[in-house]
Structures are given as C-alpha cells and as structure tokens.
C-alpha cells in the first residue's frame, strides 16, 4: 500500500529507475506518495504512473509531521535555516528560488497548515498579534505611515517569519535571497528599512 510522506531536505534529487541518474528535484515540504522503500532508497509514484527514486533519509513519514505548536514550530524553523542562501525568485517555492510569501507558505505547509499564497492575502488570514511576536508568527511590511490595524489590505508588500524576539527569516529581493535579519537596532543583522515599515504581525495555528 502506498504511504504519503513529506520532503524533509532543502531539496530532494529525483532519480530515474534505471541508473538512478538525477532527473529532477522536489522542494522542501512537498507531499509525495511512496510505493516502495528500503533504508537507502524510496520509490515514488508519479502522476503518469511511472516510478522515480529518492533517498529515504530525505523523506519524513506523514505521521511524524510536526504540529504547529511551540515544539513543531521550533523544529521546522531549524529546517528552514538550512535554506539560507537560496536565491530570491519571484513566484518561486523551491530550491531554485523562493519569494517571500512562497517561503512563509512552505513553512506552514510543512506543518500541515494551509495559508494563502501572496503576502497581502496571508495578512488577511490568521490572528492579529498586538504584543511581541512569537517564533513562527508572520511579520508583514509595507508602506510607512500605515497603522498595523490597517495592514490587512493592499499596503502589504513583504512577509517574514519570526524566529522569536526581534530576529526573523525571509526571502529578500535582489541578490540577497533567503536570509536572517533583525528588528533590533543593536543587532549585526538589523534591517532599518523593514523595522520602519512593519505593519502587522499575525499568528497561524
């Protein structure tokens, strides 16, 4: 019987059935259907009915998928840190590149929490946080001078994932890609622009 699993690695190399040569990649957090498995390799069923092979250690059984509680969020954030350095790609959600909302969506999808695709849509969902952000909360940024309570709409242009406290991880545009920054002016990774343009914090569980 086929079993479902979730991609655990930052990228998963798909190999063909013959020489198991690399033929494609699967991104972090995607669900797959495992039809055969040993300690080293797992066979996945494709929509076309053929089989491809991936390393078993790069898959997490669906039953072990973390929950969006404090422990699961900390675990998933640890995995997300492995994505630091991946390029920014508008519309992307794979090891070829992520955009800001693609990263936040992949983060929550890994814990089986569905959230909208775009940053402004994500800011309309979840629970508005009035106090300090907790790890896993989403930070929304946009035009300066707009109050946090009004940030559920078109002013949102960027989203990041709180690491707890002032630090956050996000997919930054340009040549930066996925990186860690801070809202703390005393931090070596302080981002003044984003600190000045923080509009809202929202929580998803």
Feature map (PLM): residue ranges:
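Catalytic cysteine-centered active-site loop
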Residues: 88-135
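Short, structured beta-strand/loop micro-motifs enriched in basic residues and often containing a Trp
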Residues: 2-17, 116-124, 145
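Aromatic- and glycine-rich peptidoglycan recognition patches
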Residues: 66, 93, 153-157, 162-205
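Boundary regions of SH3-family modules and the immediately adjacent low-complexity/disordered segments
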Residues: 1-8, 17, 31, 38, ...
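Loop/turn positions that initiate beta-strands
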Residues: 26-32, 136
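SH3/SH3-like (including bacterial SH3b) beta-barrel domains
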Residues: 12-28
């Amino acid at each position: 019987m086929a079993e479902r699993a979730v991609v655990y690695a930052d990228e998963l190399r798909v190999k063909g059935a013959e020489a198991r040569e690399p033929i494609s990649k699967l991104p972090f957090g995607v669900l797959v259907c495992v039809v055969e498995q040993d300690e080293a390799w797992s066979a996945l069923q494709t929509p076309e009915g053929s089989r491809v092979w991936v390393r078993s250690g790069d898959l997490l059984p669906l039953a072990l998928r973390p929950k969006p509680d404090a422990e699961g969020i900390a675990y998933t954030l640890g995995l997300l840190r492995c994505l630091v350095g991946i390029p920014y790609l508008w519309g992307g959600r794979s090891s070829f590149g992520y955009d800001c909302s693609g990263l936040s969506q992949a983060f929550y999808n890994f814990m089986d929490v569905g959230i909208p695709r775009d940053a402004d849509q994500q800011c309309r969902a979840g629970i508005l946080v009035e106090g300090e952000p907790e790890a896993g909360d989403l930070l929304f940024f946009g035009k300066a001078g707009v109050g946090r309570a009004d940030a559920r709409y078109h002013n949102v242009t960027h989203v990041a994932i709180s690491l707890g406290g002032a630090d956050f991880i996000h997919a930054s545009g340009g040549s930066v890609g996925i990186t860690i920054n801070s809202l703390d002016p005393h931090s070596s990774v302080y981002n003044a622009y984003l600190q000045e343009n923080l509009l809202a914090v929202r929580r998803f569980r």
